[in-house]
């Protein structure tokens, strides 16, 4: 099997990176660089078949062109992930932990009941702590 760190999937390599600002109602701001899954093909691929080191480098922001209620799975994903959902205006809605499925077990689907525009997948504990703070949180995509 190829070393996945040296051999990222072709569709993953097409995902651009962009600066995303995370602002908290207390005035605190953090800036991250995230990969952007904007096409249907990029969103379908996500972090599948991507090595742990590459997943740790950049969070992955799924950008939809309308509000959706899509579900996410963890098949072919190397590490457990967190996923945070955001509204069209960038307002934080909620987050979930997505463990890797047990070998031979059907994978679970993850999502939320309300619609959302953005979903951010990541493995970073620091980012999880940032998004778990009480109070209103918003993301802004820097163009």
Annotated model-derived regions:
Residues 2-143:
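Compact, glycine-rich, soluble single-domain proteins
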């Amino acid at each position: 099997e190829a070393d996945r760190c040296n051999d990222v999937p072709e569709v993953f390599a097409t995902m651009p990176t962009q600066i995303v600002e995370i602002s908290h109602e207390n005035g605190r701001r953090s800036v991250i660089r995230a990969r952007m899954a904007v096409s249907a093909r990029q969103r379908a691929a996500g972090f599948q078949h991507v090595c742990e080191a590459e997943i740790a480098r950049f969070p992955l922001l799924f950008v939809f062109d309308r509000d959706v209620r899509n579900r996410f799975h963890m098949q072919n994903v190397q590490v457990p992930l967190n996923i945070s959902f955001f509204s069209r205006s960038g307002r934080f809605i909620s987050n979930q932990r997505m463990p890797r499925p047990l070998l031979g077990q059907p994978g679970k689907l993850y999502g939320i009941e309300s619609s959302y525009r953005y979903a951010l997948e990541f493995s970073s504990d620091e980012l999880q702590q940032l998004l778990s703070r009480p109070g209103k949180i918003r993301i802004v995509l820097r163009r």
